[in-house]
Each structure stands twice: as C-alpha cells, then as structure tokens.
Amino acid sequence: MKLYKLNTHTRGCNKSYDADLVMNLKDHPNANVGDVVEIYAPDEENGTHLLLQITEFNGSCGRDVISIESGIANAFKMRPYSNVVMRIVKPADVALDSIEITFKDQYMGRSEMWRLKTYLTDTCVYVNKKIDYNDMQIRCQVYEMWSQGERVASGVITEDTKIVFRSSTSMVYLFLQMSSEMWDFDIHGDLYFEKAVNGFLTELFQKWRKLSCNHEVTIVLFSRTFYAAKSLDEFPEHMRDCLQQDYKGRFYEDFYRVAIQNERCDDWCTVLGQLRKLFTSYQATVLRYHERENMKIPPATNSSATQGNFLEVLNISLNTFEKHYLDRTFDRTGQLSVVITPGVGVFSVDRELTNITKQRIIDNGVGSDLVCVGEQPLHAVPLLKFHNKDTTLTSADDYSLPHWINLSFYSTNKKIVYSSFIPRIKLPLFGSQLTLHDGVGDGEGEENERHFLSCNQSEYKHNSLFDYDAYDEQIFQPLPAQSTCSLQRVVRAKKTSVPSLETYAYRNNDWENLTPTQIPAMRRKMSDPDIHHGTSAMLAALQPDTTNLSESLASEKNSRRTIVSIAPIVRPGRALINPFDPSQVTIKLTSNRRRWTHIFPKGPTGVLIQQHHYQAVPAKPTQAGQQRPLQQTQSNNNNDQEDYGCENGEQYDRVSSHSLLNKSDSSQSFVMGDEPIDFFKRRQNSPMNPQPANVPNLTATQAKSYLWGATGEQEWTPAITTVKHLRPIVEGEHHHLGSLEALRALDPPPDAEAGGGRGKIIIGVDWKSLTIPACLPITTDYFPDKRSLNNDYVISDYTLLPDDVNHDYAQSRAVYRKPLSTEEVCKEIVSQRLAQGFQLIVVDEKPPTASGCSSGSAVQPVKLSRETNKEYLLSIGRIFHKISLSGSVITVTGYRPRHPYPPINVDYRYRFHAPQHETYEISGVNFTTEKLENFNWNHMDLYICTRGDVDYPLMESLKYWRYRMYLLPRENIVSKIASCQRCDIFPDVTADNTREQVEDFVRLIEAVSKLKRQYARKARYLASLLQDSPIAHITKRRHSTSIISRPQPNQGLTNSPFRERVGSNRLPEKRPSINVRPKLENGRIPRIFPATDAAAAAGVAARDDQDDGFPVDIKFSPNATLPEIFEAMKHPVNGVGFFSQTQSLPSCTFVSYDALMWLKTRLNNGRHPLDLLEAMRKERMICHASGDWKKPVVPGFVFYYVVQQDKNAKDYAPPLDDYSAFVNEWLEIEFQGCSFLWHDEPVTTPVPNFLRDSPAPQSWTETSSNKRVYRQSHLEIDVNQKSDRMEWGHVKHHTVLQPRFAFEIVVEWVTSSGPIVADLIGGWMRKANQFNFLVSVPADPMAEPFTKKSDPLRGPIFIPLCTTFLPNGAALFDEFPEESRSDRMLFFQEAILGKFGFLPCVLEKKYSVGKDLPKEYQYVHCTGNMFALIRCATNNYQVESPILKEANVTRCVYGHTNNTNVPKKVGFLWAWNHMIPNKKWKAQTINNSADGELFQLKMLKDFREFCSNSDQRLSTFWTQSQELKRRAQKFEFNNNNTEENKMK
C-alpha cells in the first residue's frame, strides 16, 4: 500500500494550486482528469475517508506528494505533512443516494435546479463544499449526503442521485392558533401559549439565527369566535357583513391579527415580546369587538383547536403563494406555511374545503407544517374529522389522514417528578405474539401462527375490533344489477377497516379454505380518491418471493382480477377510517402521494424516512442482504421494557437518523456485524451488492398499508411518537463549526439511551423543514401503468418542427437572432413544465426476477439507438406529459384524466387586523382549485419555438414571471425629513427639476436600450484635428457627473453590447481660435462647447454661451430656410447627432427630443421646433425610423432618420418598412407636459388646480383616451452572455413620460433564469441610481379587500380627511358649480399628497359593463416606500367579487360579496411597499428622534396629523392656496390693464 505525503494549499494564492486536489501525473500514469480518489490515514482505515475528484495535474507538485486545499484538510482532520493512502475508486462504489444543497439570498427557479443537477452529475462533493455555477450565477453549498441508508461526508453524484434543494431565504407564514386551549395549562404547569412562544418559537428563532437564515416572515394570530344565537335577527346590523354559519347552524366569525408582515430580521427574538403583548389582550379584544353601548350582542366564545379555522388558514397562505410569479423577487426562494396549534392534531373540517386544500397544496408544491404543542394522542395524527351532516344515530364519523401535512409535536425538556415514563399503548390484535420473538424456531413459529389463523371464527365473535353494524349492512345489502370490477390501481399491502368476519380471519397467510365468494370488491371512497377498501392484503400474500414494488403490484392486480371476475360483488357499508388502527385501510398509490417523496433519505432498510418520526420498536431481521440480524437485547429484569407485539412479518424501520449514528450496543441501537453504522466509516466495496439500503420498499410478507406520513412508506403504529429529542440532530452545526467534528457531535453518548428506558431519546420537531425548508423536488417516481393510461386518461399529442418554424419566422424579424436548435427547444419545453410545477419522472430499471412477473408500475424508458433521440416523462397532479425528441421532430403527448374533479369555489369572509391598522377590517376571498389541464401548453411551446415572436404573445393564463418597477426622480428624502419635524416639506415642481428629470430619463433609456454615446467615427475632414489638447481627453453629455475616457482613434465599430452613438455630442480635439476654460457652476462641471465655422454656408452666427447639452456654435437667422436648417442638423460634428449603424436602425438615426433641444438653442425668432420637424417630415427630409411615413413627429425618445442621404454610401442602412417589427425591438416613449423645455411659454403665477376656474386634467390619459397606456418590446436578458441557454424576455413600459409622474417598467419572462434576470435588472438599478431611482413595486400595491388577486392578509390603511375646518361650518368649494366639486376634492387631496412627496401613477382605466366606476388616482412616494389612493367619494358604487362559473360553496349568511359598500368617507388609502426588503428601510431610522422612529412610520403619523387638521395645518394649507389664487388674479388683472393701456 503506497503512501503519499500530504501537503495543503490555499486556493487563489497560486494559479498552479487552484483545485481541491493537486497531484503529479508521473505518480499516477493511469489516472485521468475526472477520476475519483479516496484518501485516508493508513492507521485509520475505518476512520474518516475523503473522496476528491481529479480536475487537473500539476508538474510542480513533488513526487509521492499530494496537496489538498487547506479548508478541506482541516474539516476532515488531515494533518499536513502526514502520510496518507490514496487510491482510485469507481464512482459507482461511492455513489450518493441523495444529497441536500442549501442556498441563500437568491432566486433559483425549478428550471435552474434541473440545470444545476445536470451540471453536478458525475462530480465529487463533500460536506460544506461551495458550488459556484457560473453559467447560471448560482451559489450554493452541500449540506448533507446519504448513501446506503446512512449519512456520509463525501461521495459522487450520479444520474440516480436525488438532489434536494433547501433555501435559507424563504417566504414563511407562521400562524399561531389562538384557540381556547392557549389559555390552558399543560402537564408541566405552563400555559400552552408560553409553550408555543417561549418554547417552540424561541427555539425556532435561535436555529434561524444559528444557520444565518434570512426568511421573509409573516406572523399571524388567528381564532374562531362562536356566537350563541339561533337566528340572524339576534345580531345588530353592523355585525352581519362577516357572519358565517357552519353545518350545525352555529354563527361564527374568524379573526386574524397580523403581528409581523413580510419582515426580515437578524434576531427574531425581539418579536417574542410583541407576541406576548398581543396575547394579553387578544381574547378580550376579539370576544368584545362588537360591543356597543345600549346594544345587545349574543354571547361570544372562543372555539377549541378542533373546531377552529385550520384549513382556512392554509388556503389564505396559498392565495398569496400561488401568485408568486406576479411579485417575483430575486433574493428568496421557497414558500412555507406553518400552523402552530395548542391542540393535538385533530380538526373538524368541511369535506369540500379539504379537497380544495389538498389539491392546492400538492399542485402548488408548498410546504405545509403543523406543529402541535399539545400532548400527542394514542391514535394517528394529523386527523381530519369531516363534518357529519347526517344527524341519524346510525351515522358514523368519517376521518381522513392527510399525507400532505408535515406533522411535528413539540414538548419541553421538563421532567415530571413522579415519572419519566411516556406510555405508548397498543392493544394486541388477537393474542400474544411472544412466540415470534422468544427464540422459538421458525418452523414452530409458523405452525403456531397457522394454527391460530385456522381456528374457528366463532371464538373471536366478541372481539371489540369488529363493527357489527357495518358488517350487517354489508351482508344484507342487495346485490347490484350488474357485477363490475374496479380498474383503479391498488398498491402496497392492503387491509380493510370494515372487513367481513371471513375476510378478517384469513387476512394473513392461510388460504386453504378461501373461496372467491368471500371476497368483497373494491369500493371507491368519495371523500378521498386515494383510499380504497378491499382484499389486496390476501392477494399480495400469494407472491411470497416478490422482490420489488412494481412486480408485487402487477402480480397483485393480476391475481385480484382473476378472482374478482367470477365473484359476485358484495359492497361493504360505510367505508370508514379507524384512527386507532389506520393500517386496516387500503391506500391507492397516486402521483400526489409521491410528489414530495424524493426529499426524504432512505433508511437502512431502503424505506424513505422522516427523521423526526421515531419508532420505538426495533426492526425485525431480514433474511437476505445482511451480514447478521440486527441485534436486540432483551432483559426480563427490566420492568420498564414493554412488548409492543409485532405482527407476523412486520418489519419496523427505525427512522431516527440518531440510530444511524449510535455506537451503543443497547437494545435501541443498530449494529451490523461488529461495526456500528457511522457515516464516516469506510464504505462497502460496492453499493450494487444486496445491502440493506437496497431492500425493496415493500415485501409481500410484510402485508402493510402505508396510510400515514408524508413519505408514503411509513406505517403508523402506536409505537411511533414525535416527542422532543433531547439533542436535536438536524441543526446543521457544521455550517458554523467548519469541520466534520460537528457531524461527529451528532452521535449521542454511548449510554444515552441505556439508562432511561425506552421511548426517551426521541425526535419530535422537523427542525430541518422549519429552518431550511426544502423546495419541491424536481423528480418523482410514479407513472400510471399502460392499462390505467388507456382506461382512465384522455390522450392528446402534437408535433413541433422547430427548424421549419425558425426558417419561417427568421425572415420577418427586425433583428436576426440565432434560433434555438431542436434539442435546445426540447430542453426548454421541459424547463417550462418544471417551472410550472411539473416533475421529471425517473423510473428505475429493475432486472427480471425469478417470479417472472412483468412490471406494471410505470412506462419503462425507451432504449434509444441514436443520441438525438430523447424522452422525458413529467407529471403534476393527475396530468402527465411525455416529450419525445426524434431527429428534428418533437412530439408532445399529454395525458389528462378522463373524469376530472369538478371545480369547487369557496367564498370565505373574515376580519383581519394588519400592522398600523386601527380595527379589524372585513375582507373576503375565494378558495378555488385550478384546472391544470386547461393550461395552453401548445401556445407556450410555439412561443418557445418562435423565440418569443409577436404571433404568440405571453398571455395572463401562461402565468409568466414579471418584475414591476417605478422610475422616480431622485431626491435625498430621508435626510430632508430627518432635519425637519414635519414631512410636508416637498416643494412644487420647477422648470429646472423637470429638465433634469427628463435628461436623466433619456440617459437611463439609452442604457436599457444598449445605446451609448461615445466616440465611434470621425468625419474624414476632421482627421487632421485628432491631436492632443488639454481638454481633448474628456467629454461630457448633458448633466452627467461622470467623465468618459476618449477612445482610441482606431476604435471604430466594436463588438460591445452597446450600440454606439456619434455626432455632435463630442469635442473637436483642437480649436486654436477658441479658449475654452471649464468652470464649476453650482458644483457641477459645465459642458464645453467649442465653436466651428462649418455652418457658415447656412448664414449663421457663432455662439458658445449656451449650456443645453449640445455644441452651440450657430444661431439661425430669422429668415433661415427649412433646407438650411436641415443641412445644419445633418452636420457630422455640430448636427443633432446620430447613432452608429446597428441592426434594425437605419443610418443617420436620432431621437426627436435631441432634435427639439438642438433647434431650441438655435432659433431666436419664436419659431416652434416641433413645427419645424413636422415640416421636415412632410417634405420627406426625415421619417420615423421604421420607414412609416404616416407617423408624425412626436416629442420624446422616439426614433427618426434622415431620408435625404447618400444611399450609395458604404454605411447606408435602409429602414425596415415594418412598424410593428420595429416597435417590438425598440423602446419609444413620448414626452408630455414638458413642452416648455423646447419652446418658450409665458410664465404664469401657479394656481392650485383645485381652485382654478377650469381644472387641468389629472394626467395625459384623460385627454388622450385613445392612446395606449403600455407598450411591450422584446428584451435580450443575457446581455453579458453568461448563460448556457438562450434567454429572452419582454419589457412593458408606459408609452408617455410626464414629469413628476412615476414611469412604470415591467420585465416579463418565461425562458430566462432568475439569477440572469436579477443581474440585468441590478445593472439597470445601478445605472438608474446615478440619475433617478428605480424601485420595485407589487403588482397590486393597495391589495384592497374583495379583489381577485389581492393578498388576503394585506389591506390599505384608511386615513380620513377632515372637511369641516372652514369657519362657520362652511363647505369646501361652495363657490364653484356643484358638478365640479367632486373632482375638485380629488385635486385637493392630490395637492396634499404632493406636499408629502407623492407622485401620481398612470394606470389603465377599469371598465365595467353597465356600471359607473368611480374616478380613482394612485400615487407612490418618491422613496418608493408607500402608496396612496384617492377615490371619488360621491359615486354610489359597490365592489364585487369576481364572477366565477364554478359552483359556489359559501357559508356567508348575509347576502353576497357585492353588498359590501366601499366607505363613502373622504380620505386616503395608504399602503406599504412590501417589495422593498424591510432591512433597507429599517436602516432609514430618524436618528434625531427620541425613540429612533422609523422614517415610514413618521411619514404615516405626520400625514394622519395633517389630515386631521392637527395644529390647524390643514386650514393653513387651504388659506395659503386661496392666497395664491388671489395673487394670480391680481397679476392677471394688472397684465390686462397694461395691455389695454398700450392699445390706447
């Protein structure tokens, strides 16, 4: 065994040592790059083993020397200069079964996860390895790895490795159920609220901080209040809007108190005090909320946890989560809903709402955790008890065990003085089974069992497990007219909760006396489509040697079909679940049950496990694949040890990962041979050997049904408990310790369990899910068999020919772009389905077995002969897609259910109290299921094929991602407000401010459009002037504060992503006749404008005293002709300035705003620049850059080109002559409200708009009703060419810029990666911060109640406006006509908002057939932190919930949603911008305030005071406005008198 000396190196210090492992090729002539080597100390062969991959060879490394990166060596305790053994290993021998990867503060879509998985395949990883995927700009870290049923420290990722992505920055909703139990005491004497807050939440927040989690958290306290009333008449009128009625006729209201909303904190423990404060007054506030003087209210009581609004809470969070694509942020990934209840996990629920909740949670891939702080019951939980609307005595309760809820039980570390024993009781089924574990021989045990099973049934007639009523109903039920056979696929080992006595007696292995007539047929249960009741347990036992799941399923199905086909159908009675013995229920395997399974690791027996579910009964030894049986020590003297009575053939899988690491030889430890299971030990030689990890998930002899648990592979037994672990193992300490010592610390002391008896060291809380929640896995393993596909599904398919499509569309594009190849289209089609929640179906290829049964579980992958042939299987819910690539043809085959579930819509009313609100507001939402089969995938696939062509636009139904932004004028707001006591300090708009905003806007749009003004080419006759001069190396554009270096003379056209601009905005490098001396004006560097004699032929005089952004060296004479002005505009140096040649732009292109400003500085005879440009267009001197002659000259950032140019010139480029194709490539924005910038207008004394005789319209939309508000253009996302995929999107923007208005920009995409889009927008924001302020805003800023897509727990704050401040009670605007008063009130409110720094937002008008919708204006604060909305108060209108075609399920007792009238009070609606991370705006604390008041809260407080006329501020503002009007009238009167005197 050859030894090598171990050296260490630091990555980055030396280019030769920039890999994890550096070695000399001479030492390993047979080694290749990509090989995996195993490194360990020779004296610790069973100790720590490190696996690394060879990425390069280094000749500078000495002989017999290897070098490892120092951080890795320290983590694996490898000492420098020590001798180590290194050998090459086969990747298959060290392959990983699953790996968990964590990431933080970034958005990683499911498409990116798939690409990252492909990138990581065939690579070697180790604990804490940092992964940088530069192509996608993704940064992540290895968290945990599993192989052969145990955790390991390093391994190789293969195609079969399941990758779990966990996010440290998720959107987390914490719901605290404030039911009546919260005020009860637990067995330790603590309030359950104290247990939840001081215990669970305190621990949770500590773990968040320990793992540096940065979740965006919302904390909500919720409860249900019942009223003791028999009719609606007992309630006063003001209460009836929100009342609902349950199935028993009880009236109730649901209350939600939002304590924290969309916040991020470094230390969440500060929030605990706030929760304790809310707790003290919560119950009294809710129960007495409606109390009024001299008004009788029915008595109110707080509901129990069981009767509470548990499912409603989950749906409320889902209403927010399912709109994630509308408000996409780039610093978080993942969604988690956590309900903390003082109950025991039992809830009384509505059946329809349960079905909706289940489908929505599964389809949306949202993690849902239930944390119970009550004591765990002795039955299966979580348990949903359906409302029993049948009041007859014979009706039985119906239950459901939801697999889509991850359950945790939290208990404290306190010990009860009188006992430390936790009772776990299960009654024996038929008798003692001690003979199975007493060391009796196998033959004797089987004989005893057979004797027991063959005995007379009458001996067990009185067993309490039988439901005699159900048995009688089953026996005496009339036979159906026709025998039928269910073709639903039945899997796993099956039992029945309501069996016949015959079936029960023969339910195990005794089939001697069985006749077909004794077997009842399957009956589908209406409440849960996954649950069946039948006899598959008996049938499964016919295959004693079945070794894999799919074969047992196939054989079971065949056997059942053979028997049932000759049997009369005997239908059982009410098919119910017994929560004390759920193993008696048959579960149908569906894709829903397997949706989350790939996030769970496999235990030692190969069964997927949940690490916080601990089963106290040790596993029974298996007969094959183990070196020796798992050791179990029994002692007759240990009184605390109990016999849990395992059934014959049962194999309990201990699922605590603690057991995998335990080195104890006690009765609780797993020992294989003489070697404890440790994930640092040396691996087995080959994982392909029949090790325990490869034991199939289910054997026929187990006879199990796995109803309980999220994995779908764990059976509930009373032995399972979820009590708190004394030492949680899943905390990720190794993230901070930086070494594997932390992982070793997960092992408990050897005697941790031996001394305290059984059931003590147990894990109860899934801390990993609650701290670093897993994202929905991108793979699953369920696909229907062929028979089910044919019988239960409708099949449709279509083909795509990307090459032909690209050929057709390439001709019509304005800009040529490389089309996607057929293979790229195929990958993108798969990516889009993954992004919408689909999962890739991976099917294990099983070798044929001796039984010869063919697999019926899935469609086997096609073995393809050519590399260009690929096939992908994907699924979501009951929808399956098969995407096949064959040569240049892509075939998409869809399977949708033949009988889809009917859509249900639940109308739900509630009261919520959000932060900074003063009352509980009424709101209503709809909970509805989404018909996934209606998604238009054909349109999406053609959109991909055509690379986003306008023929296939993005539609709302495609759920594309979008990022909405407002461009705002940049002002130092916080410092202004910090220096003032009040916030109404914002001045009126001035001409200088307007010009600066417009100039800065033009700059940003140039950057967004990749247009850059810089030297590109020189006129030939100026070549002699290219010499050095003192100022020749700097240039300045407009009001820029940056200095641009002069490029080299030979730079010319480059490959820069920017389109360059040439023309007048540059300097001749030497003008001896002019002495230019730059000076500072107002702290800014002025522009330098040298004169020239080039325009002498046009009859102009040279000037250099203008500062307008252009070289001013000419002034047109009053009689200058249009051709003369046109020739001066075309001048290559002093003209208006053109963009360099670029694709889709004709040569000599400019923007109209530049031309207008160029003309303004050169006209002194009052001629209007816009009229001159329009005259040039009519004379066909200039034209719109698209070549459309019908487009008039529009002021703004609109492209035009010079028509009269040399068409034979070398650089001549004609226009496209296609207006629609042109506007799809370029952003064009019209400027309105700023014509005074290019044409002098008379100065008038400003009069407030609300006091003018004829008020000006609020925005341009009221005067240009036929003009589009938005326009959309193509957007290249990957401008830096970083991605490994074709990425593009669209930019939607306002068509008009109006100064002092917010300008909206929306980025939309489906075929782009989150990090790449984030990089693009981040560049825009950095650019904008030099000129303006680009801030992200939500799609629905106000989130008004009863609107379709609003956040259910968000709502605007109503701030009333005092309108009675005038003396003598006079009304406002009495002197004006009555019909104008409502509009004047809006303008008055707008003026108030303007004083506080709010800017108007232009929105598309809302239209409604036959309804008079009110005028409403929306505003955003110049910091972007707040929104405001004002609405006409005189319109009598109502807000309606959206009309839905589905059948409404409503519990509202007072009319419908449209009875909720919007308050007619005059005031403002105020909302916060939750898209701005609160860490940023919390940093904007007003330091000089006494309590460190936040800037936003100071704004709200001061605005409220102003509107309430505190300190007569509102009346003072009114008086000042009236004074401005009087001054204006006096000024106008004096001007009129002056003109009359002149005329006389």
From Swiss-Prot:
Location of region: Disordered: 615-649, 1037-1072
Keywords: Cell cycle, Cell division, Meiosis, Mitosis
Any single Gene Ontology cellular-component annotation: GATOR1 complex
UniProt biased composition (Polar residues): 623-639, 1041-1057
Domain of life of the organism encoding this protein: Eukaryota
Effect of gene knockout: Pupal lethal. Under nutrient-replete conditions, larvae display a significant increase in TORC1 activity, indicated by increased phosphorylation of S6K/p70S6K. RNAi-mediated knockdown in the female germline results in a large percentage of ovarian cysts delaying mitotic exit. Instead, cysts undergo a fifth mitotic division before meiotic commitment to produce 32-cell cysts with a single oocyte. Double RNAi-mediated knockdown with GATOR1 complex member Nprl2 in the female germline increases the penetrance of ovarian cysts displaying delayed mitotic exit and producing 32-cell cysts.
GO MF annotations, alphabetized: GTPase activator activity
GO biological process terms on file: cellular response to amino acid starvation; germarium-derived cystoblast division; germline cell cycle switching, mitotic to meiotic cell cycle; meiotic cell cycle; negative regulation of cell size; negative regulation of TOR signaling; negative regulation of TORC1 signaling; positive regulation of autophagy
Keyword RNA-binding: no
Keyword field contains Cell division: yes
Pfam families attached to this UniProt entry: DEPDC5_CTD (PF19418), IML1 (PF12257), IML1_N (PF23013)
Role description: An essential component of the GATOR subcomplex GATOR1 which functions as an inhibitor of the amino acid-sensing branch of the TORC1 signaling pathway. The two GATOR subcomplexes, GATOR1 and GATOR2, regulate the TORC1 pathway in order to mediate metabolic homeostasis, female gametogenesis and the response to amino acid limitation and complete starvation.
Similarity comment: family membership: Belongs to the IML1 family.
The protein, known as: GATOR complex protein Iml1
Organism: Drosophila melanogaster
Lineage, highest ranks first: Eukaryota, Metazoa, Ecdysozoa, Arthropoda, Hexapoda
Gene name in the database record: Iml1
